[in-house]
């Protein structure tokens, strides 16, 4: 039995290919899925009137409590949707939100993959065809990470 981590962008996690891959791997392994939601977070920020900004490391910049709440709400919605989808399949779903005490710390899902890398035997990051080269560059120094596009 292996420890397997899968991170799926919010644009991918609703696909049948993603679901089948995760369920197949979960049959014989311990499976953790990190949900994404970048596109949906951006849409929610725009709807609320916020400018979407990223830092030099590609992480979303949040300056206000409300922005962090928007991120949290989107990610928790994605997490709950995936949990419902994988009920009874032996899959643990988490969102990229950390808490330091009671302080909410949304973290980029790719950064969370890097942080968890030491504890997993296999890691898969799912993205879109349009983003695969960028995603491969993000993980080029992480040999356990396999980037897949749907």
Language model features: what each stretch is:
Residues 1-150:
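Nucleotide/pyrophosphate-binding catalytic subdomain
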